[in-house]
Amino acid sequence: MVDVAESRRTQRAEGPRTIFAIATANPPNCVEQSTYPDFYFKITNSEHKVELKEKFQRMDDKSMIKRRYMYLTEEILKENPNVCEYMAPSLDARQDMFVVEVPRLGKEAAVKAIKEWGQPKSKITHLIVCTTSGVDMPGADYQLTKLLGLRPHVKRYMMYQQGCFAGGTVLRLAKDLAENNKGARVLVVCSEVTAVTFRGPSDTHLDSLVGQALFGDGAAALIVGSDPIPEIEKPLFELIWTAQTIAPDSEGAIDGHLREVGLTFHLLKDVPGIVSKNIDKALVEAFQPLGISDYNSIFWIAHPGGPAILDQVEQKLAFKPEKMRATREVLSEYGNMSSACVLFILDEMRKKSAQNGLKTTGEGLEWGVLFGFGPGLTIETVVLLRSVAI
């Protein structure tokens, strides 16, 4: 007779849930923020909107972004004039781009992550793919399975239309899969392209213009599992605890809708205030059981929705100037890449920690936190990624 309790127990991993590899990828087209307003208003035939262009220039100047990477080149946009108009029917053209570029960019990051991991891809048991850039069937998870040559029976999870908080969501799901499936090795891929949100400017919808100043394209990939193989798998961060919550009284703060005109985004001005007002509660829930109340003593990875959010969080928690260094660096060099952003920040942090000779992947600190913020307003907390010695 089979012992059901024992059967359940043997299916669970015993060791810590660990990130073994991180890699990123971007399209080759690099856009300098300082000259982007000229390009944007020219390509959208909006140069006559002088005052609006001046507003957009100020947005770009305040964004704290130096450059972004975008799949959409001048040539592609000229071939698709409806994509350049404000609210012109264009979903078919956008979808044609999305179904190719999201898996392609995701593959580029995944190949790098698998190489760093150092194990054959046949050992990947689960695949999580996340994108806010569109929907299709079979999904980007299926396309990636084919592009990477993964086993046909790999267990796939496709997450569409989640938004900027989803970098935390994929880690939460990967943690649960790794700890409840002994021997699991989870490939996580977030791939985002702005082809679905790009459109010309409007005098009456400045929140749309904010998105045009912030969003960039990028993909990030991770390998997650439990019980590292000694001398072969190298732990980078441990996933300790996760949570998701909806901020009270935040309905409509951030939302997006897939329409015939593409994906439209709407933001309330008080998004930074909502985030900063609710972050204390999330931190207490996460760190009180660990006896941690000094949030300057942990390393920070926060989704860089924009500089105003980071400024208010820093002020609210009385942060030291360098506390958000990795987050601000990624915002500066890549812009807001939605779900992929926090994974880029993880990569930036562990690389700089090694370059600076620090004792852990988390800027020399033992404990840390990862936050994702997005539509809902939804807050994802990953408590946090405990760093291990380099």
Swiss-Prot record:
Active site: 164
Catalysed conversion reaction: (E)-4-coumaroyl-CoA + 3 malonyl-CoA + 3 H(+) = 2',4,4',6'-tetrahydroxychalcone + 3 CO2 + 4 CoA
Pfam families, per the entry: Chal_sti_synt_C, Chal_sti_synt_N
Coiled coil, from the record: none
GO molecular function, one term: naringenin-chalcone synthase activity
Enzyme class, first EC level, given as a word: transferase
EC code(s) of this entry: 2.3.1.74
Biological process per Gene Ontology, one example term: polyketide biosynthetic process
Entry keywords, A to Z: Acyltransferase, Flavonoid biosynthesis, Transferase
Pathway: Secondary metabolite biosynthesis; flavonoid biosynthesis
Family, as annotated: Belongs to the thiolase-like superfamily. Chalcone/stilbene synthases family.
Function: The primary product of this enzyme is 4,2',4',6'-tetrahydroxychalcone (also termed naringenin-chalcone or chalcone) which can under specific conditions spontaneously isomerize into naringenin.
Protein name stated in the entry: Chalcone synthase
Native source species: Onobrychis viciifolia
Gene: CHS
